[in-house]
Swiss-Prot record:
There is a cross-link at residues 191-193 (5-imidazolinone (Ala-Gly)). The keyword Flavoprotein does not apply. Transmembrane segments: none annotated. This is Phenylalanine ammonia-lyase 2. Homotetramer. It is an enzyme of class 4 (lyase). CDD domains: PAL-HAL. NCBIfam families: phe_am_lyase (TIGR01226). Its EC number is 4.3.1.24. The active site is at 97 (proton donor/acceptor). Keywords: Cytoplasm, Lyase, Phenylalanine catabolism, Phenylpropanoid metabolism. SUPFAM superfamilies: L-aspartase-like (SSF48557).
Amino acid sequence: MENGNGKMEFCMKDPLNWGMAAESMKGSHLDEVKKMVAEFRKPVVQLAGKTLTIAQVAAIAARDDGVTVELAEAAREGVKASSDWVMESMNKGTDSYGVTTGFGATSHRRTKQGGALQKELIRFLNAGIFGNGTETSHTLPHSATRAAMLVRINTLLQGYSGIRFEILEAITKFLNTNITPCLPLRGTITASGDLVPLSYIAGLLTGRPNSKAVGPTGEKLNAEEAFRLAGISSGFFELQPKEGLALVNGTAVGSGMASMVLYEANILGVMSEVLSAVFAEVMNGKPEFTDHLTHKLKHHPGQIEAAAIMEHILDGSGYVKAAELLHEMDPLQKPKQDRYALRTSPQWLGPQIEVIRSATKMIEREINSVNDNPLIDVSRNKALHGGNFQGTPIGVAMDNTRLAIAAIGKLLFAQFSELVNDYYNNGLPSNLTGSRDPSLDYGFKGAEIAMASYCSELQFLANPVTNHVQSAEQHNQDVNSLGLISSRKTSEAVEILKLMSSSFLVALCQAVDLRHIEENVRLAVKKTVSQVAKKTLNIGVDGVLHPSRFSEKELLRVVDREYVFAYADDPCSATYPLMQKLREVLVSHALANSGNEKDASTSIFHKIGVFEEELKGILPKEVENARASVENGTPAIPNKIEECRSYPLYKFVRGELGTELLTGEKVRSPGEELDQVFNALCEGKLVDPLLACLEAWNGAPLPIC
């Protein structure tokens, strides 16, 4: 913190920063995500060195022309003071690392040519490989480069690095005009900082002939063209002593990419909670798994919040009410509990949310840190030689985040597998097939195979990076963080989790529509069975009330019990359970009516054939009419999802994106629908409908009563 004179004053009430770390974790994760989204959408990022957020980094990275960077003018004095100190120190003959000495393991060398030393630093660090770009790109994505530029400016603004303010202004102009230096994808161990990639930013600033940049429309630029388009009229910079080191000796590339990754990971964490609740809805799950007492007794805040969010989605849901009625029928013949992928989803997701949230705070501390060497302490008139360039917080945070992402993906895969499996999904068709003829529709079978592939790759990526450290630079950099490598692997993991989340969301929407068809077809079948029963079973041939009339209620209970999609493609087939169970009811009544069975006028056995023939003449047509009414938008029963808190997600996928029920009768493939949802997720279009599902949540679980 700063005192009234603008000098840094470190808080002695919390000298170890644990209090600040704990304070930053107050409040719900959802509120934090909402705050991130709001920050991401702001048009200006104001840099002062100490208040940068991962959302702001993600915004600069992703929104090429929608956001502007502004530097705090108040920082100019401190930046200038450290720059002046370096020049004065060198003029006095003070020996300082990287100013009068060589670098790393060769720091025993000495020189008085400070400017030439910085020039050589940039030259020898330009050791990256880009390739010809025809097959595989070895260039860091320009979004990650923009993130690195922003984070490096933020560090250097704090006035401990010995660099001119004008250089920071030049990098800012590159950002604001969408001029992006080309950095190599690989070649850094993030200790001593991200030396190799950051040297290419310095190379552009100094006009090195090998430096390249990309313009606003993707055009390739040399240094001269980049300066002209950015409006930097001062010409290429001749680096002063320490300035090259200030530019390259930092963790900005690793922490910049980590910020981008964590912005998405936090949103995907919330999405996994909502998708798990929708999964419970379409699976006819029992909602008691979200009861607050269960989770309060476990104590973990991530679990408690995950359960409370799911509880909020399920509270008042029409699916939950229907499921309660379903579970009341024949309760002893059904599992008492749902499977783990549903029932323990809060316990599974909670720790992952905690890990992602903790990693977010760790990276936010890193992007607001001073992480080069040496540090210039003007107030004490000294250069401090330390190791803040060691990016261990990045490597550790990213390894942990990747584990959490893999765990979330594993849960989504388990849920997806249950959803498409008719042994487990409580009446939905196998593979979620939507056609009238399931023998010519295999629904989401291909998507399930793809999900297995995604999940396998994601589990492999969960392996840690930070235990693969190699001693580098003549054993001077004998331990190093591998921060950027871990960030890159976590970025890959996030992409795969987005593939899985998109696939699962489309499958859930398919399940919602199938439940809607199921409900309308069941109603049509009940009406038809009731109508046929009254016509054929109530009155005997002599006009007298027939004993079989008492079977109607049991016949309707059969319709309630039987899974619609077990017979819907051929409702009167003798090999399907509906007709078999209806016949069983009539046979049992006939057996109980044994005394009257010899008389044709009172025999129930004689009525069975009449009932079945009448049903065969009407039922297939009524089932088709019910299905057609759903497809035409005129169903007898509206879609339950419209009254549910999860509706905004469904509405977006079906309404905004224009997707529809997938069937083998149509040409459209699952991949076409999945692509639409995936692209929308990547573009951030799913954020608003996702948060709309939780708009009414007050941040607390339902009371225990």
